[in-house]
């Protein structure tokens, strides 16, 4: 997917979960909105280069959005977790996700389940069972191992319960972990961070819920990031 026009700055601090202060090359200090409300472990330290977009909306209190971080180790991570669904939709449309390529109809944000949930994507195809796809962002990486979650996620636990129920009703159910960090080539659940989520995911797999994780690639043109896209399946370590 193509990124909006981005500007670079130096990260000073992140605070109140939603905000980050950065310094431009001319010394000006800006406050960015941060869409990622998680722990963001390893996603940006003071002095890292960040890339931000600017909205034309006159009603936004903070028109600048933190999009990417270039880490000191040379790796890049997308901070804007809204991009994970956009990336996944593009990959589904272009048949990049081979495990789901037989489906022709993609319905986003469909209400389902018994816990007042919305599925990220409901896939439909001729003579195929409906396929419920829940997308999660992978931004936490240690030693080339992608991990989810980076904080306790009761919402994620709810989604797993809903997917298990859909599978029991005869549908396909998928948890899709979309890479937003280009530094991992394997994926697993962060049991030490959210053991309840890890236990539920293990139960979901036993019930037939499918788990896939795809890596991400960032394109840089004229010394700035211009696009990112999902590339290939990475090994899921149960």
Swiss-Prot record:
Matching Pfam families: SfsA, SfsA_N
GO molecular function: DNA binding
UniProt-listed InterPro entries: SfsA, SfsA_C, SfsA_N
Signal peptide (from-to): none
NCBIfam families listed in its UniProt record: sfsA
Family affiliation: Belongs to the SfsA family.
Protein name in UniProt: Sugar fermentation stimulation protein homolog
Name of encoding gene: sfsA
């Amino acid at each position: 997917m193509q990124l909006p026009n981005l500007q670079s700055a130096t990260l000073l601090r992140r605070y109140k979960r939603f905000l980050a202060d950065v310094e431009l090359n001319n010394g000006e200090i800006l406050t960015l909105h941060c869409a990622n409300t998680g722990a963001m472990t390893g996603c940006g330290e003071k002095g890292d280069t960040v890339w931000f977009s600017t909205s034309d909306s006159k009603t936004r209190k903070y028109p600048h959005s933190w999009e990417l971080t270039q880490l000191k180790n040379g790796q890049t991570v997308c901070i804007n977790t809204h991009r994970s669904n956009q990336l996944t939709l593009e990959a589904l449309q272009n048949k990049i996700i081979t495990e789901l390529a037989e489906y022709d109809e993609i319905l986003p944000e469909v209400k389902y389940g018994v816990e007042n949930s919305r599925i990220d994507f409901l896939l439909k195809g001729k003579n195929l069972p409906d396929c419920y796809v829940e997308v999660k962002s992978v931004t936490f990486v240690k030693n080339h191992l992608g991990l989810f979650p980076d904080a306790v996620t009761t919402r994620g636990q709810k989604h797993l319960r809903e997917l298990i129920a859909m599978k029991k009703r005869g549908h396909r159910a998928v948890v899709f972990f979309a890479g937003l960090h280009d530094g991992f080539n394997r994926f697993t659940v962060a049991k030490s961070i959210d053991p309840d989520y890890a236990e539920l995911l293990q139960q979901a797999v036993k019930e037939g819920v499918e788990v896939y994780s795809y890596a991400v690639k960032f394109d840089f043109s004229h010394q700035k990031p211009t696009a990112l896209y999902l590339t290939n399946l990475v090994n899921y370590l149960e």
